[in-house]
Every structure is written in structure tokens, then in C-alpha cells.
A protein has these predicted regions:
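A conserved regulatory-domain signal marking ACT and ACT-like small-molecule sensing domains
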Residues: 1-145
Length: 145
């Protein structure tokens, strides 16, 4: 069994997820984990698929041939559970360039691994000033805590 990490980007249009899921299903792949987004007119997605080793190459070829979608695919080992503590960090701040770099630098220097980052940009209710919001999931080795 192979685990494929599929990263796709292309102009958003209806039916892209249906197309991806049909191709994966055709090769008896099991869609396991995904994060799919519409960003400024583009579809961007990351999908983990488990598929039989003998079907991997044909699945990869067909995914790369989807019209209007650029897919990069890596074969990965499934995650083995490590002894880690997961922390959740929620950030709300006045928006400015460099916030993500500052946060990721602190996480890195504390031997943390940024597992997931979801961010958005909103307007403050009264002032209309740009507000940066983020929720980060961080894994820290229990030996480092």
C-alpha cells in the first residue's frame, strides 16, 4: 500500500473535486485526509490517498493529466505516532507584513513543528482596520517540553 500526497492548483471551476475523486476511485484509491480551498479564483488542495502499490503509477499519471489542474505527487510513509504534545495557538492582531514569519520563527526556535495553519484577513468592526487571524496547531516533542 502506498500513501500519496497530492498537491493540486488550478483555476477554480465547478467539478474539480468530482474529477479528482472519480480518478482516485477509478484506481481504488482511498481518499483519507484533505484540505481544499478557493483562493483568489484558484482551487488549491492537498490530499492524502492510500492506494495499492501496483495502481500507484497509473493513478499518478492520470492525476497529472487532468486538464487545467497542476498536480504534484509524492509517495510518503504513513505517519507513525510520535510522543508529542499538540498545542493550539490562536492569534488576532493588526495585520502587517511578516506576522507568519515571526510566529513560525518562534515555533522553530522552540523545536516545534507547525502541523496546521489556518489564517484569514478581516476588517475590524469599528475602525475598518485590517485584522489578521490565525489558528495554528503545533507539535512539540515531549522531551523538549
Amino acid at each position: 500500500m502506498n500513501h500519496l500526497i497530492i498537491s493540486c492548483i488550478g483555476p477554480d471551476k465547478t467539478g474539480l473535486v468530482d474529477t479528482l475523486s472519480k480518478v482516485i476511485s477509478k484506481h481504488q484509491g482511498n481518499w483519507q485526509v484533505s484540505s481544499l480551498h478557493h483562493l483568489s479564483g484558484f482551487f488549491a488542495g492537498v490530499i492524502e490517498v492510500a492506494v495499492a502499490s501496483e495502481k500507484s503509477e497509473s493513478l499518478i499519471s492520470e492525476l497529472k493529466a487532468i486538464n487545467g489542474l497542476s498536480c504534484q505527487i509524492e509517495v510518503a510513509e504513513p505517519d507513525l505516532p510520535d510522543v508529542v504534545s499538540n498545542l493550539v495557538l490562536e492569534i488576532t492582531a493588526n495585520d502587517r507584513a511578516g506576522i507568519v514569519q515571526e510566529v513560525s520563527s518562534v515555533i522553530h526556535h522552540q523545536n516545534g513543528n507547525l502541523i496546521k495553519l489556518i489564517s484569514s484577513n478581516d476588517s475590524a468592526a469599528h475602525s475598518g482596520q485590517d485584522i489578521f487571524k490565525a489558528k495554528a496547531e503545533i507539535a512539540i516533542d515531549d522531551k523538549s517540553v
